[in-house]
């Protein structure tokens, strides 16, 4: 049986992941065309490389289809409920940083804090009879942040 390592399948995260492992004596490379999700591992026996989107890696870890994965902590926290009980971070790789921010249109000159946003949302709901919507792909992280604000 081999260990299955999930890594990002494209872009800067894949390149940085391959470079990080290469610097530690484990060579990762794509095999086949750019459209194929095939890869090879050199420098260590018993390790199978699985190329996935960074967003799929948390779920594949949780499901047990991969044993190790390289992805962002933002994606782990967003995709997995009670993530602390489901996965164990092993190494901080030092790349792929992401800042999550709450932004409003420039014309909202009176909204400078989360409390201001809360007031604007309350006024919006009273006027329009439905809630103000926040566009995000990080629903859980935004909800946790706003509940704690």
Model-derived regions, located:
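Domain-level signature for soluble enzymes in the chorismate/prephenate branch of the shikimate pathway
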Residues: 1-149
